[in-house]
């Protein structure tokens, strides 16, 4: 696999030099300074690409070209934003970039309640606490009909949790959930957040699927024509939250996805940390069944806690994910492609990482500190080497 690394551009505290020293060769990045929906111009793409190449690296994957909210709700100028998206893809292809990761999650990108959860060894991880999230919905946001989402036991627990929160706790939880995370292109106030949620109040999962299908049928033929692989990222966490529809969460969703738009350019980002939160998701089966449509891999593990809807991000080779067999399945697919004459390796990045060692004293992007990801990348490099020697005679 191609060893890649997510970089948030010139303002990222982890530099391109740091990344090269970590052993990665591919960069996963985006033009974060361009507003959602606007066209990425060729000059801006070339400028970023040149910056990366001058550091001895290559721009391997775009993560992400954001999908404008009006595309997701099919309101306002959604057709304009779709046309802009097509032009951005054409411009990327003209600059030699061939893989685009994106998501179709409404309102929020990935969601956590704690961005600095301390583990027994003193390292810090990202965590999603189901009861804390319920307290936010029920008592801070006060989302209409939120009580229908939670059973009586959960509502009582959420009330107790909220009653024990200080004003500082409330402000911190609110910021963690709605203020935007690295890679999320939107940040909201509480009122703005509810306004965004209200845009989806009449959009069921079934209707939302028709919106995704429309987007796919507009975009994927263009991607197919120009040689770009589209790799949709799953919902994170992979279940409905905040009353919003979530439609890229299970193996059934993946099957619907490829049947809806069967062109080969229509594929997946296999994010083990997102899909793996659900105990009913068999990640090895998902990887094997859709191997020929996996164009990008985020390798990360999570650990479900006593409440199975609560989880924290585990060390990369620990937790609930069968990483050994997932990586083995990815290598099987990679060798199948190579045997058929393809030369492109599957780009893989260590997704997130614990905040450890010297990074505990630094300001870092949540989940994207340097040393935790360096550790994860080294572990995956070793796992890949061992698998190749034992199973692939390489």
Swiss-Prot record:
GO molecular function: ferrous iron binding; manganese ion binding; mannonate dehydratase activity
PANTHER family: MANNONATE DEHYDRATASE
SUPFAM superfamilies xref list: Xylose isomerase-like
Pfam families documented for this protein: UxuA
Catalytic function, reaction form: D-mannonate = 2-dehydro-3-deoxy-D-gluconate + H2O
Enzyme class: lyase
Pathway annotation from the record: Carbohydrate metabolism; pentose and glucuronate interconversion
GO BP terms: D-glucuronate catabolic process
Source species, domain of life: Bacteria
Protein name: Mannonate dehydratase
Cofactor(s) this protein requires: Fe(2+); Mn(2+)
Coiled-coil regions listed in the entry: none
Keywords recorded for this protein, A-Z: Iron, Lyase, Manganese
């Amino acid at each position: 696999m191609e060893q890649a690394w997510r970089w948030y551009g010139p303002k990222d505290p982890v530099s391109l030099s740091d990344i090269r020293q970590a052993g990665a060769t591919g960069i996963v990045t985006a033009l974060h300074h361009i507003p959602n929906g606007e066209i990425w111009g060729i000059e801006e793409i070339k400028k970023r690409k040149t910056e990366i190449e001058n550091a001895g690296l290559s721009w391997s994957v775009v993560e992400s070209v954001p999908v404008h909210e009006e595309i997701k709700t099919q309101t306002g100028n959604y057709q304009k934003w779709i046309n802009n998206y097509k032009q951005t893809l054409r411009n990327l292809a003209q600059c030699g970039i061939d893989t685009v990761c994106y998501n179709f999650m409404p309102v929020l990108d990935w969601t956590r309640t704690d961005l600095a959860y301390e583990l027994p060894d003193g390292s810090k991880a990202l965590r999603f606490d189901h009861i804390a999230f319920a307290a936010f919905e029920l008592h801070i946001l006060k989302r209409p009909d939120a009580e229908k989402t939670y059973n009586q036991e959960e509502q009582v627990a959420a009330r107790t949790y909220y009653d024990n929160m200080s004003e500082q706790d409330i402000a911190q939880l609110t910021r963690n959930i709605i203020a935007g995370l690295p890679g999320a292109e939107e940040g909201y106030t509480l009122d703005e957040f509810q306004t965004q949620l209200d845009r989806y109040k009449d959009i069921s999962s079934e209707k939302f699927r028709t919106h995704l299908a429309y987007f796919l049928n507009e975009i994927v033929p263009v991607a197919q024509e120009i040689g770009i692989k589209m790799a949709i990222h799953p919902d994170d966490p992979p279940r409905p939250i905040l009353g919003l529809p979530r439609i890229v969460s299970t193996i059934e969703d993946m099957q619907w996805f490829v049947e809806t738009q069967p062109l080969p350019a229509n594929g997946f980002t296999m994010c083990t940390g997102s899909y793996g939160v659900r105990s009913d998701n068999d990640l090895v089966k998902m990887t094997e069944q859709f191997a020929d449509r996996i164009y990008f891999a985020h390798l990360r593990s999570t650990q479900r806690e006593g409440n199975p809807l609560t989880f924290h991000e585990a060390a990369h080779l620990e937790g609930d994910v069968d990483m050994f067999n997932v990586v083995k399945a990815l290598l099987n697919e990679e060798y199948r492609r190579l045997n058929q004459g393809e030369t492109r390796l599957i780009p893989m990045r260590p997704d997130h990482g614990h905040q450890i060692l010297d990074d505990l004293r630094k300001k870092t992007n949540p989940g994207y500190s340097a040393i935790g990801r360096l550790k994860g990348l080294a572990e995956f490099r070793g796992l890949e080497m061992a698998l190749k020697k034992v199973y692939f005679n390489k």
